[in-house]
Amino acid sequence: MNYTPNPIDTSAVSLESELMQLVEYMAKNNHDVWAKERIAQGWKYGPCRRDDLKEHPCLVPYELLPEEEKIYDRNSAMETLKAVCALGYTILPSPDTK
């Protein structure tokens, strides 16, 4: 199989500073979705990753993740929001969040 990834070009998109809280919410949610899926597959917390025992050190609340893992989740969230903007959508907070 010959596969060439072709992601949406987000290089010209910069997110407003007001969206950084949304980035953090989305990063936490991404982690929670990932963790819930792993737990449903029988994985549990372990101090180091052991695929044979289904143990993973990141099966902890987002707040307890090492900073490099949080950065990974934040970057994923930022790229998603930037792709939404690059596709011509506008992200606005609901009136309840102001």
Residues of each region from the PLM?
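Alpha-helical propensity feature that highlights long, continuous alpha-helices across diverse contexts
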Residues: 1-98
